[in-house]
Amino acid sequence: MFTLKKSLLLLFFLATINLSFCEQERNAEEERRDEPDERNAEVEKRFFPIVGKLLFGLLGK
């Protein structure tokens, strides 16, 4: 029973690492394909909600 748990844990660990590497590769490929304008739009989409929440929190108190 112990060896089965050990094997499953090892398999899960290796699968998690493999998935992580796949995501990093995919993100790198997407960055290479993106045009600079598209990347700026993504940054703006992430930036404005954060600033809005921060200002709302400061002004709301």
From Swiss-Prot:
At the top level of its lineage, which domain of life is listed?
Eukaryota
Q: Does the keyword Signal apply?
A: yes
Signal peptide residues are 1-22
Biological process, per Gene Ontology = defense response to bacterium; defense response to fungus; innate immune response; killing of cells of another organism
Species this chain originates from: Amolops loloensis
Q: What is this protein called?
A: Temporin-ALj
Which cysteines pair up through disulfides? They are none
Query: Can you tell me which family this protein belongs to?
Result: Belongs to the frog skin active peptide (FSAP) family. Temporin subfamily.
What is its subcellular localisation? Secreted
Record function comment: Antimicrobial peptide with activity against Gram-positive and Gram-negative bacteria and against fungi. Has been tested against S.aureus (MIC=7.5 ug/mL), B.pumilus (MIC=15.0 ug/mL), B.cereus (MIC=75.0 ug/mL), E.coli (MIC=15.0 ug/mL), B.dysenteriae (MIC=30.0 ug/mL), A.cacoaceticus (MIC=60.0 ug/mL), P.aeruginosa (MIC=7.5 ug/mL) and C.albicans (MIC=5.0 ug/mL). Also shows a weak hemolytic activity.
- The chain residues annotated with the modification Leucine amide are 59
Any chance you could tell me the propeptide residue ranges? 23-46
